Structure formats: structure tokens, C-alpha cells
Amino acid sequence: MTSDRMVAYMKQKLFTPEEVQKINVQEWVYQPGVPANIVPVHSAAFAAVDSQVTTWKAGGPASGIHAAKWSTHEWLHFLGALPDTIAEARLADLDKTFRLSSSGNSEIEFAWLRIAIRNHYTPAFAGLDHFLTSQGRRKFVAPLYADLAKTDWGKRMAMDIYKRARPTYHSVAVGTIDKSLGWNGAK
């Protein structure tokens, strides 16, 4: 199937000429970016998470966040909406309330550990070490090492962990992380 064949099929079997124009098939199929006639999507679940983020950013305690039934996607939305810089006490409150440093969900833990690295939240570093030495997926480990490599303290930590974890990683991950850390095997 090609784009041309798909458009021809749509014109022949699915849509009237008026619908083809209204839908703007040409733009959807052949133009870059999002078409002008896209229908905005509203997620009630994410709106509820956004409300919790707003309350937390205003100083509300983590215990006030109603997250018991959140899915992984809601957690990722929440963590992604947090500010870049967060005070250690606020991080500790989130971590204590939701055990984010040891969540057991790789997606959530990865997002949390990136926040912990960015804010030098040391209570999460044992969990970071465990994550990097037990989780080999490049999509998780490479960004964490890259985040660590942005600071002197992080680079030292990354090298220490990587020296131990490197033999367990897939060769593609090793190639990526070697470049990120400037690994030469002697460190």
C-alpha cells in the first residue's frame, strides 16, 4: 500500500468528493505537521491530574494528591508537569507518600529518577543505582546516564555505576552510553 493508493481508495470507497475536501485528505496525508482541521482532544483524566498538579505546585502536601487509581499514563503526566526545580523537602514528601524511588514501574521510576537527578535529590540515588544495574533497556538507561553526565558529581556517579553495569547491557546501549560518558574503559 502506498499513500497514493490509499488516497485513491478513500476517494473511491470511503468518502464523497465533498468529504475529501472537508476532511482535507491531501493535507493529512502529504503535508508535514498537524493539519489545520485537527479536532482538539480533551482528556478528563489528564484534566483531573492537572488539577492535582496545580494544588501541589501551590504548596499542597503530597498526601492531598488523589492518585490511588492513577494509571501509568496519569503518573507520567503528573511527573512531566512538575517544575524543573523542586525543593528537597517537596521531593521527599512525594517520595515518602508514593514511594517513587522504588515504584516497581519502570516508566514511572524512570521519570522520577530524571527529576531526582535534575534536583540532586540524594535519597533517590540508591534506587537510581539499583535501576541502572538491573534495568538494561536503552530507552531508560541512556537518558539517565546523559542526565548524570551534565554535572561533575553526576558524571562520577555515572562512571561508578556504569563500570559495574556495562557488562550486562546490550551492545547497542553500550555504544550509546560509551559516547555519552566518554567511556574509554580505563575509568
Positions of predicted regions on the chain:
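Amphipathic alpha-helical substructures
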Residues: M1-N37, A92-I108, I115, T122, ...
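Long, His/Glu/Asp-enriched segments that create or flank divalent metal/ion-associated functional microenvironments
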Residues: W28-E107, R137
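Extended alpha-helical scaffolding segments
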Residues: L94-L100, N105-K187
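Hydrophobic transmembrane alpha-helix bundles
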Residues: P17-F46, T55-I65, G127-Q135, P143-T151, ...
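Short, hydrophobic/amphipathic alpha-helical patches that form generic packing surfaces
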Residues: Q26-Y30, E74-L82, A111-R118, P143-D147
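Exposed alpha-helical structural elements
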Residues: R5, Y9, V20, N24, ...
